[in-house]
Amino acid sequence: VKTVLKDMLSRRLLRIKVVKALFAHLKSGADNMIASEKTLMTSVDKAYDLYFQILILPVEIARYAEQRQELAKQKKLPTHEDLNPNTKFVDNQIIRVIANSDAVNDYAAARKLNWTRYPELIRTLYTQLTESDYFKDYMARPERSFADDRKLLEDFFKELQSCEPLDNVLEEMSILWSDDLPYIV
């Protein structure tokens, strides 16, 4: 999986990490380059983790949306919309590919990456997503296409770059992630 990921992290992010590690090594005055290399590799590994953590985020939001749809069907007096929800987002082809990817699932499980401790963030991001114009346009289109599914996720990831609740949670998860998010999404 890591060999595939090397292509997924931007060269710019890797260069920044190398420069920061080199600067830290020179400032420390240490002669031991091995410790500095280990610090650099830890930083790069954490960037891989962030990549996967962000990659599984739309999957968790889609699961939350699906749970909401199932709960709505169980109301005492469900509406027509409750009984026949628009499942376009839940059935997003790209989200399904990510959710069913053994490579993604294996890496996330091995590194214990998930969003289970942050249901309030998932709820907040779901609300922000469903209130956005690009989501409303996506859901209103009668046809389903891979290009539309991709565009929805592109817009969602762009929006994540300035999402304060996400920044706070990511910083809580790992202090090394606070500066990397713009380069990952």
Feature names for model-found ranges:
Residues 1-185:
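Class I Rossmann-like S-adenosyl-L-methionine
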